[in-house]
Amino acid sequence: MLRAQAEIKFTLLNQNYEGGKHFRPVFRFADGMLFSGTVISDHTEYLYNHLYTVDIEFFTVEDEAYAAIQPVMSLGMGLTIQAGSRIIGIATLLDYSYVGQKAAC
């Protein structure tokens, strides 16, 4: 699983988003590299055009996916935040770590 800390900002005019454990937008790392991530923070709502520092857990990023995106990842890189194919915001990657899958016995 990939864990990240990022600054996020939602850019759709006058559109706010509800926070909570079920908030899982899609983050675009590069062309064709889209992963949903659970945004973890104490905020119950994300307001239009405000900057928030949050943690994000990408449960669907496992060994093979991480091997594909790791070469393009760098601190300070920009990501787009999407709902389906619609871009709803931007993010800046502040920190990240990866915990790989353990081999089955």
Show which residues each predicted segment covers.
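C-terminal effector/interaction modules appended to NTPase cores
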Residues: 1-105
